[in-house]
Amino acid sequence: MLDKIKKVYINNSGAVTVEEDMSYNAGDKNVSFLQINGIDISILTQAKIKTPGGQIITKTCSNVDLGKNVYKQVLVPCDESGVYQVQIIQSSRDKVSCSNIFQYTVDPGIE
C-alpha cells in the first residue's frame, strides 16, 4: 500500500494553506501522513489532533530531508470516520507558536 501524504503549508504568522483534498480512508493506518512545509526543521514541532470522538492526540513531527526538499512529517490517525481538527505547535527555547486550526476528513471504509 502506498503512503497517503497530504501537504500543508504554514507561514510565519501561523496561517495554514492545505491541499484541496484533505481526506483519507478509514483503516489507512501507518500510511497516512501530513507533510508540513514552510517551517524551520530545527524547531521541535508537534501536531495536536482532535478526533471525531473528542480525544486529543499529540504527535511529534519528524524531519524529512530529501536534499532540496526538507520538511516535517507526522503520521495521522485514521481509526474512525469523521472530521479531525489539527493545530501545529512549534516550540523553541524562548518561543511557542501555534498555527491556525485546520482539518482533514476520514471517509468510512467498505463495510
Task: For each feature predicted by the language model, list its residue ranges.
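N-terminal assembly/attachment segments of tailed bacteriophage virion structural proteins
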Residues: M1-E111
